[in-house]
C-alpha cells in the first residue's frame, strides 16, 4: 500500500481530453436550456473567466503556457499538453533550469530537480494535505474522501504503527487467501492461457487489502470490493473532467454530471455496508464480548482515541483502499511484464524460483523468509526504478513563502513537485535504461542500506522521501512478494507468441502499467507447497 498523493493531475480515461472547448460550451448551453439558470449571473461568470489574466506568482520559467487570446483558451491548451506530454515537458524544463513551472489542471505548479528532494521532503512548511483540495475539489460531495490526504494523523499513524507491527501476524492470512484468489483467476489449465497482468494484480491485491482493512466478512463481500475498486478507478477521471471547468461552476457541474453522481452513490452504498459492522462490534463489546479484531476498523478507532482526533470510519477506509489498491497492483503488474520481456526470462524466473524454495522450505512464511527473498526484492526495486508510478512525485503545498538553500523562492500557496528522473541518472545507475535484476542485490552486498525495496532515498523515490514517505510501503512490499511467489512457483509465464515490449500508459503525472498488455500463463507443479 502506498500512502502517496494519488491522482494529482490524474486521468484514468481520455474522455476529459476529448471533451474540448466546443463540447464544453455545448454542455453549458444544455444547462441553460434544461435548468433555466440565471443567464446574467452565468454570463457574468463566463466574462470573468474569459478575460481573467494569468497571475504571475513566480519568476521561474513557465514551460507550457499555451497560446490564445483568453486565459481559458491558454489554460485548456496547457492542460491538454500536460496530460499527454508531461515526460517531455519535464525534460524540457530541466534542460532550462533546476526549478521551473508547469501549467496543470489545478493551476501552475513548480517542478524541482531531484537535487532538491531531501530538502523538500524534510521541510516543515511543505505538506501534501492542501493539494487535494485544489485537485479533487474536496468541498464537493463525492470527492470528500480526498480531504484526508496528508491531513489525517489517524490514518497515517494507524498505518505506520498498527499495520506495520502486524505484518508477521498477517502473513498466513495473505498467503492462504492468495492461493485461492490466484487459482480462481489463472485456473489449472496445462496449456498456455492469455491473461491481463494488470487485471489479475488488481483483483488479487484489492481483495487481500480488503481482508486486512475490514476483516473476513466484509472483506470478502463482493459488493464492498466492487464499490471500493470502482471508486478507485472512477474518482480520478471524474476529478479530471471536473477540473476542465472554472472553479465557480464546478459545484453546479458536479451536481449534474453522471460520473460525479456515481461517486456519491458509491460513498452512500459503502457506508451502508460498513456502519452496521461497526455498530455490531460496539454492541457486542458493550455486552462483554472481549474478542480482538486485527483489522483497520479497530486500528483507526484505537488510534483516534490515543490521538484524541476525530475521523470518519468510511472515508478513512476508502482512502486506505485508494492508497493500497492502485500502487501495489501497478508494481506487481509491471514486474510480471518486465520478467516476460527479458530475453533470458526463463533463466531469471528459474533463479527466482530457487530463491523462493530456499527461503521457504522447512520454515514457511515468516519475517526471515520474506527478508531472504533478496533477488526478488532487487527485481521489484529495479522494475520500480525503470517504471515509477509517476513522472513527478512528492507533491507538497507551501504554507508560507520559502527560500530554499540555493536561493530559489517558493511563493506561499504554491504546489511543488520533484521531477522523478534521478532513477535514470547514469551518474547514479550505470546503464540506467537497462533492466539489471541483481542491481540492488549487488549494492546491498556492498553495504548500501538504501538498496532495499522499502528504502526511501533521494536516488530512488519510488515510495517518496522524508517526513511524508509512504508509511504503508512495508505492507505493500510483503503483499507483492507473497503474491509473486505464488505466481512464479505455480505457473510458467511468457509473452504471447506475437507479443512485444509494451510501453507504460502515460496519463497526466501517472506512468501506469499498460492495461492492454497481455502475458501467457500455464499451470506447473510447484516444488513445495506454499
Curated annotation (Swiss-Prot):
Record keywords, A-Z: Heme, Iron, Membrane, Metal-binding, Monooxygenase, Oxidoreductase, Transmembrane, Transmembrane helix
CDD domains: CYP503A1-like (cd11041)
Record PANTHER family: CYTOCHROME P450 (PTHR46206), CYTOCHROME P450 MONOOXYGENASE AUSG-RELATED (PTHR46206:SF2)
Pfam entry (one): p450
Listed EC numbers: 1.-.-.-
Origin organism lineage: Eukaryota, Fungi, Dikarya, Ascomycota, Pezizomycotina
Ranges that cross the membrane: 31-51
Miscellaneous remark of the record: In A.calidoustus, the austinoid gene cluster lies on a contiguous DNA region, while clusters from E.nidulans and P.brasilianum are split in their respective genomes. Genetic rearrangements provoked variability among the clusters and E.nidulans produces the least number of austionoid derivatives with the end products austinol and dehydroaustinol, while P.brasilianum can produce until acetoxydehydroaustin, and A.calidoustus produces the highest number of identified derivatives.
UniProt-recorded Gene Ontology molecular function terms: heme binding; iron ion binding; monooxygenase activity; oxidoreductase activity, acting on paired donors, with incorporation or reduction of molecular oxygen
Cofactor: heme
Record's function text: Cytochrome P450 monooxygenase; part of the gene cluster B that mediates the biosynthesis of the fungal meroterpenoid acetoxydehydroaustin. The first step of the pathway is the synthesis of 3,5-dimethylorsellinic acid by the polyketide synthase ausA. 3,5-dimethylorsellinic acid is then prenylated by the polyprenyl transferase ausN. Further epoxidation by the FAD-dependent monooxygenase ausM and cyclization by the probable terpene cyclase ausL lead to the formation of protoaustinoid A.
Name of the protein in question: Cytochrome P450 monooxygenase ausG
InterPro entries, alphabetized: Cyt_P450 (IPR001128), Cyt_P450_CS (IPR017972), Cyt_P450_E_grp-IV (IPR002403), Cyt_P450_sf (IPR036396)
UniProt pathway: Secondary metabolite biosynthesis; terpenoid biosynthesis
Chain residues that bind heme: 470
Cellular location(s): Membrane
Keyword Transferase set for record: no
Topological relation to the membrane, as annotated: Single-pass membrane protein
Amino acid at each position: 500500500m502506498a500512502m502517496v498523493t494519488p491522482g494529482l493531475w490524474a486521468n484514468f480515461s481520455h474522455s476529459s481530453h476529448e471533451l474540448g472547448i466546443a463540447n464544453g460550451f455545448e454542455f453549458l448551453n444544455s444547462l441553460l436550456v434544461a435548468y433555466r439558470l440565471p443567464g446574467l449571473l452565468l454570463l457574468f461568470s463566463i466574462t470573468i473567466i474569459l478575460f481573467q489574466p494569468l497571475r504571475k506568482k513566480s519568476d521561474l520559467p513557465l514551460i507550457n503556457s499555451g497560446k490564445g487570446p483568453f486565459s481559458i483558451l491558454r489554460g485548456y491548451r496547457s492542460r491538454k499538453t500536460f496530460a499527454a506530454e508531461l515526460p517531455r515537458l519535464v525534460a524540457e524544463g530541466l534542460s532550462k533550469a533546476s526549478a521551473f513551472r508547469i501549467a496543470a489542471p489545478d493551476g501552475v505548479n513548480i517542478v524541482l530537480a531531484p537535487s532538491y528532494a531531501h530538502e523538500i521532503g524534510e521541510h516543515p512548511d511543505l505538506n501534501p494535505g492542501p493539494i487535494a483540495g485544489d485537485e479533487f475539489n474536496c468541498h464537493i460531495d463525492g470527492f470528500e474522501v480526498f480531504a484526508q490526504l496528508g491531513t489525517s494523523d489517524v490514518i497515517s499513524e494507524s498505518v505506520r504503527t498498527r499495520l506495520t507491527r502486524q505484518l508477521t501476524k498477517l502473513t498466513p492470512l495473505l498467503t492462504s487467501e492468495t492461493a485461492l484468489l490466484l487459482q480462481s483467476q489463472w485456473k489449472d489449465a496445462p496449456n498456455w492461457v492469455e491473461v491481463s497482468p494488470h487485471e489479475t494484480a488488481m483483483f488479487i491485491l484489492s481483495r487481500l487489502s480488503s481482508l486486512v482493512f475490514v476483516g473476513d466478512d466484509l472483506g470478502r463481500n463482493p459488493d464492498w470490493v466492487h464499490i471500493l475498486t470502482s471508486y478507485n478507478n472512477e474518482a480520478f477521471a471524474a476529478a479530471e473532467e471536473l477540473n476542465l471547468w472554472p472553479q465557480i461552476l464546478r459545484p453546479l457541474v458536479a451536481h449534474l454530471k453522471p460520473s460525479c453522481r456515481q461517486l456519491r452513490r458509491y460513498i452512500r452504498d459503502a457506508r451502508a455496508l460498513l456502519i452496521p459492522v461497526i455498530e455490531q462490534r460496539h454492541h457486542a463489546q458493550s455486552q462483554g464480548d472481549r474478542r480482538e479484531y486485527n483489522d483497520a476498523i479497530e486500528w483507526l478507532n484505537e488510534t483516534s482515541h490515543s490521538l484524541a482526533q476525530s475521523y470518519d470510519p468510511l472515508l478513512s477506509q476508502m482512502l486506505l483502499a485508494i492508497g493500497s489498491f492502485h500502487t501495489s497492483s501497478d508494481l506487481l503488474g509491471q514486474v510480471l511484464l518486465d520478467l516476460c520481456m527479458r530475453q533470458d526470462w526463463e533463466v531469471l524466473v528459474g533463479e527466482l524460483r530457487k530463491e523462493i524454495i530456499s527461503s521457504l522450505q522447512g520454515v514457511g512464511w515468516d519475517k526471515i523468509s520474506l527478508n531472504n527473498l533478496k533477488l526478488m526484492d532487487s527485481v521489484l526495486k529495479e522494475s520500480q526504478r525503470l517504471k515509477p508510478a509517476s513522472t513527478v512525485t512528492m507533491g507538497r503545498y507551501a504554507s508560507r513563502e520559502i527560500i530554499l538553500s540555493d536561493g530559489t523562492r517558493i511563493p506561499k500557496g504554491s504546489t511543488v513537485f520533484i521531477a522523478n528522473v534521478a532513477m535514470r541518472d547514469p551518474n547514479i545507475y550505470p546503464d540506467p535504461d537497462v533492466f539489471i535484476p541483481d542491481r540492488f542485490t549487488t549494492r546491498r552486498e556492498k553495504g548500501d542500506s538504501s538498496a532495499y525495496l522499502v528504502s526511501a532515498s533521494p536516488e530512488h523515490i519510488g515510495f517518496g522521501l522524508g517526513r511524508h514517505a509512504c508509511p504503508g510501503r512495508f505492507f505493500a512490499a510483503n503483499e507483492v512478494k507473497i503474491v509473486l511467489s505464488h505466481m512464479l512457483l505455480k505457473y510458467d509465464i511468457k509473452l504471447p507468441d506475437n507479443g512485444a515490449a509494451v510501453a507504460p500508459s502515460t496519463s497526466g503525472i501517472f506512468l501506469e502499467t499498460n492495461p492492454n498488455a497481455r502475458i501467457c500463463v500455464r499451470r506447473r507443479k510447484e516444488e513445495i507447497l506454499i
